[in-house]
């Protein structure tokens, strides 16, 4: 027995079988007949159980009944919200280049040592100057090195004096930025391998949360020691991050943090620590392990290797 277009297929004994998701299952044709797949609507209605038919769905009948079957709407999967983008010229950079670099054991501060023919600090400067989001760069350095930066800069620079501690240097640089800046990015000039993509990702997180810092999950096991040099406990590695720079913060938030640190005599070792002291959130932006701080001769060799690989990749 064959079924023709427009003819309702008889339900099997007990009614139509329901397929997962609430649709009727396939109807088996009698021997010698042509099989017919029963959609959600059969004949003039939809099967909801043995012998029970409901009115046809809005929009018409199914194909088996000679009408147009309404397609089932499937909700779209939620897509992640794209990162926020800063407006052009809305970010000020404080480039820290006032360190002495005693651990390098060189005749000059580490940030001025040549790395593949160019001082380390100038590699860092070039990354930020090329970003459309960056309006200005304030270089915190000894006045004796200002000419070095001015000769290499693509745009006019501002300068600030280094302080006794890192937070003093950052505060001096912060005092020189434009009042129109939405964000201030603080970067160690001795990190010459940071990429434009990393900086822009961190800018997006800072716009969203008020403060952000580049970081990478720690690889080794970290142990906390007591005063006598014995292991006190092993820290949970999955929760630990090594933070880098840039550290990007809303200027008003950074200023408020510095005021609190000064008022309470707090000791901080990086810039987002002052935001933490305020109880405000700091987002960690996933960075790369190549964004090293050149501090020792071994670091210099590693940085040379990474930079050579990048140059070779660009030339290929």
What are these regions (language model features)?
Residues 1-66:
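N-terminal chloroplast transit peptides
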Residues 72-85:
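N-terminal plastid-targeting presequences
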Residues 86-146:
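N-terminal glycine-rich phosphate-binding loop and ensuing alpha1 helix
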Residues 158-159, 164-225, 244:
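Conserved beta-loop-beta/alpha segment of the NTase-like Rossmann-fold superfamily
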Residues 95, 121, 173, 187-188, ...:
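Residue-level signal for inorganic ion chemistry
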Residues 223-247:
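Short, flexible, basic/aromatic active-site loop/helix in glycosyltransferases
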Residues 114, 193, 234, 248, ...:
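Short aromatic/basic micro-patch
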Residues 240-316:
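Conserved alpha/beta core of the MobA/IspD/sugar-nucleotide pyrophosphorylase nucleotidyltransferase superfamily
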